[in-house]
Amino acid sequence: MSDSPIELMRSTLAGFQIAPDVKTISNIQDIRAQIQSFREKELEGSQTKFKVLSRKLEISTQAMESLKQTAESSQHAEEILSREKEKFRIAKLLNITENEIMSLESQLQKMKEQLLQLEERENTSEDICQSEENANMLKLNFYHSLGFDLETAENTGNKRVIIHTENDLQTVQISNKYSPYFYSNYFWDLLDDSKDKK
């Protein structure tokens, strides 16, 4: 056996088995890393929850403050709402009234136009009646000059024609059985006969 220190150290080191220890140390380091990661995640989760709870607390505080203000001004808000409803109702009534006024104005304008048309027709009818009366007067004067006189019975309304000739006087009753054309020819024939007798 050599007494050299170097050889002694080598033989001593050769007797140690460090591979299992190295593996154990590596496993310990992995576990520590996992624990550290888990703690960091837990911390992040706790911080997130804390932020969420803080935000909820802030919102709840604001809501409570808003509720207090609303409770204090609820009566005023109801009055404003009631006034707004009344304004809306009045505006609606005004709109309906304006539409009715426009409709009535349109109807009035149409009635004025119809009245004007009726007046024009009445004036035209009066002119026509006047013209017819004038024409009838001319016809009666003409027939009278020929010896024809038209008479109407007051009690019955029947009409008759009295024909005056130099030698005779004839009366012809006018009936609806015969046409005006028939009577016209008949009267002219009488005139011709009276002329022939002359």
Curated annotation (Swiss-Prot):
> Sorted alphabetically, which InterPro entries does this protein's record hold?
Ndc80_Spc24, Spc24_Fungi_globular_sf
Secretion signal, residue range per the UniProt entry: none
Q: Name one GO biological process term.
A: attachment of spindle microtubules to kinetochore
Coiled-coil stretches: 51-130
What SUPFAM superfamilies does the record point to? Kinetochore globular domain
A GO CC term attached to the entry: spindle pole body
Q: Where in the cell is it found?
A: Nucleus; Chromosome, Centromere, Kinetochore; Cytoplasm, Cytoskeleton, Microtubule organizing center, Spindle pole body
User: Which keywords appear in this protein's UniProt record, sorted alphabetically?
Assistant: Cell cycle, Cell division, Centromere, Chromosome, Coiled coil, Cytoplasm, Cytoskeleton, Kinetochore, Meiosis, Mitosis, Nucleus
State the similarity comment.
Answer: Belongs to the SPC24 family.
Quaternary arrangement and interactors, per the entry? Component of the NDC80 complex, which consists of ndc80, nuf2, spc24 and spc25. Can self-associate. Component of the NMS super complex which consists of mis12, mis13, mis14, ndc80, nnf1, nuf2, sos7, spc7, spc24 and spc25.
Function field: Acts as a component of the NMS (Ndc80-MIND-Spc7) super complex which has a role in kinetochore function during late meiotic prophase and throughout the mitotic cell cycle. Acts as a component of the essential kinetochore-associated NDC80 complex, which is required for chromosome segregation and spindle checkpoint activity.
Name of this protein: Kinetochore protein spc24
